[in-house]
């Protein structure tokens, strides 16, 4: 934590230089906010709370309750300096039968998340964001909970940001501990499933026009301890850097579609990479493209990327082909949606034979394939029809039936953590199993929601022939945020 504060202290020169050279920025950003790499904002709320914009509530006439006043607390008479407060309380229960897919007593996790944030704006050009979090867990058959589940208190985010407009270009830089989601969700995510979310430390800078953008970054992950703030340190063994471009597809090309194309070139370095029981330095490069958005009633999220580099003395040659799409079965925004996702993550070589062909996501969404954390996009092929419907404006129901296979039967089945299910590399049947996924979200208000989730993983021969079994996952949580 001290090194993070020292690093933040070194940034005033950068901030002052950028503020001096920038013109006064308009309140609206040039590039579409939904595609700027900061996540989705719905009803004013974003998973990354600093991505929210509550400036309208600086006008007392637009506030509807006392909590609205916390969104713009003026620190100067003019209101140029103000702070936006945010917070979340989430109570959750997870019940998992046969944890780790072994025939064993069920696990119950009773989880508490508490988060508080303050976003201090100093004029149009400068802001400082700080966020602290607490994670608590109790229950049965817990084992040794990770520091992302049990943590007395953590400085989850702390950064300084400077931005402005130079001519017809928005420019900016953010330095410190932050969430980073500028890429496909299966590749980079803040992992909201964790009680303490995934964060990184370093620099992100950008330049954006109305139709294109370039973002560059150099980041190291946070290595959390489970006590106070002093044991939450910058991980010295891992580093993630790269460049992401963004282009707005002209609306006239597809009849008014809102589509975006994001090519990216990344590098991930890991001094303690692990595959097949072997540990050593790894450097992995990513070159790919993310295409996403809406075209009429169709929503798409497509990613293709090639990965290469070295792990110890082994060359890397891997691919991700990730395709999710759905169609709205009606004209209203609340109409049911029918779709499917089909994904390919190459595999092979994890145990030292030939090239390492296992695809690897830097820190992607770890619950997309299984809330039980039993699958990850490495040596994996999946196909899943999906359906969602809102029988009432406040209730959203969704379902999926996912079939999963190994891409290479000479390599293992991998968990969300990246660790293999030991012994599966010796089974020569490709079928991993099927996953039934059901979810209901009841949004009582923009601030309060209740979620229920059920999954059943029916283990296939890739797992059962190595001694693993099926599992049920049942969870419920209530979340209040402001």
PLM region descriptions:
Residues 2-5, 14, 20-106, 123, ...:
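N-terminal periplasmic/intermembrane-space "pro-region" immediately following the signal or transit peptide
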Residues 58, 95-112, 121-168, 186-189, ...:
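Surface-exposed loop and membrane-interface regions of Gram-negative outer-membrane beta-barrel proteins
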Residues 87, 114-120, 157-162, 203-207, ...:
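Residues on the lipid-exposed face of transmembrane beta-strands in outer-membrane beta-barrel proteins
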Residues 166-171, 187-352, 410, 423-427, ...:
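Signature for the C-terminal beta-barrel architecture of outer-membrane proteins
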Residues 444-477, 481:
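Predominantly the C-terminal beta-signal and adjacent terminal strand-loop region
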